Amino acid sequence: YYNSLNTDLNEISKVGNGQTWDISSVSGGITTYTKYELPTKGNYGYLYPQATYFINEGGNSEVYYKSDDTGIKLLGAPSASFINPGIIEKGEIRPPIFEIKTPMNVGDQLNQTAYLVIDIPVSIIPDSLLNTLPIKPDSLRLKITTKYNYECTGSGILKCPGKDFSVLQQIANITTISNAEA
């Protein structure tokens, strides 16, 4: 197993145009898949009217995207309220960020900063928590700042078990900072 994995890690470190990354010898006992569905089939599609599809990541975990000729943008994901878990909050990425940008070529870089913002109504926050604050806010917002830096470092053929794919290789550096605002 180690020799196979080590060989495959060496394969994916190659950069530049015209590469062949051969990971066809990798095997495992688990099969996973991702199902893309229309937003109207999601429990929270109404929160993301501009979405073109969503991915259900299990249970009520849904992630909404918009796809057009510029690429695929992440719009957000609803989540249970931190204060009242029975309430679902709209987790919105501001501005929407590219998961995939098109066209993209070897040497291209993409640097983005996005904010996942969850507005929390003060009415659902217990007074015992609000009374500990120096001022009484009229609203609260959870803000998660994420910086995405992508570089397209290679292109070629990815040989997988059972099928080959034409691919672009990316290196991604992602940094996240969380804070609450009143």
Indicate residue ranges for each PLM-predicted region.
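Conserved functional acidic sites
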Residues: 1-182
